[in-house]
Amino acid sequence: MNATTPLSVPSSDLERNRFFMVEQQIRTWEVLDPVILDLLMRVHREDFVPSAHRALAFADMELPLGHGEVMLSPKTEARMLQSLMIKNTDSVLEIGTGSGFITALLASLARQVCSVDIVPEFTRSAAAHLSAAGIKNVTLETGDAARGWDKHGPYDVIVLTGSVPVLPESFQHSLNPGGRLIAVVGEAPVMQAQLVTRTSGGACSAVTLFETCIPSLKNALQPQRFKF
């Protein structure tokens, strides 16, 4: 299947809704990598959505998880994932486990994933969901990783699922040469998804992928503010 070949419409309501999520939301938002599109058909998003919002599992919106956090919209998840070009030899760090759905997607592509969340409830529920999905190449940690997490590093890929007003340099230092990092940087209402790449010489370059606005990581590094 190439990037422009549409999938056939499934017969069941559940699979039909998943199909339309991929074809109408995700593919139309410049996500054309067939590996990513196929992955989003195979990994069951509804199994990671809080039961109160399960009917909205395929909706083009963020879903509340509690504790001020959200499950990102499907197209945002897909666009971030596509930009990282994850290989099956990559080690991945995820900051903000949340529902565990992005964790599952990352683990389906990479060799190993370390996912950290400051909320113990999220770590516990994600562990149950990942186990039910048969995903075993994930290490879940509970802790404050908003300003860095060196344990198990360095990494080939780092994903921040919450925004940061300023991207701490510690994350860049935790990247292997050739490593990629994606984060939403800025403060509401102006935030941008940025892809950071570390060169073989150790320098980092960043490109802006798209504009969005998502909740901040708890205890995120704040910019210096002038006082008058």
Question: Positions of the model-derived regions?
Answer:
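Class I SAM-dependent transferase core
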Residues: N2-L93, F101-A104, L109, F122-R124, ...
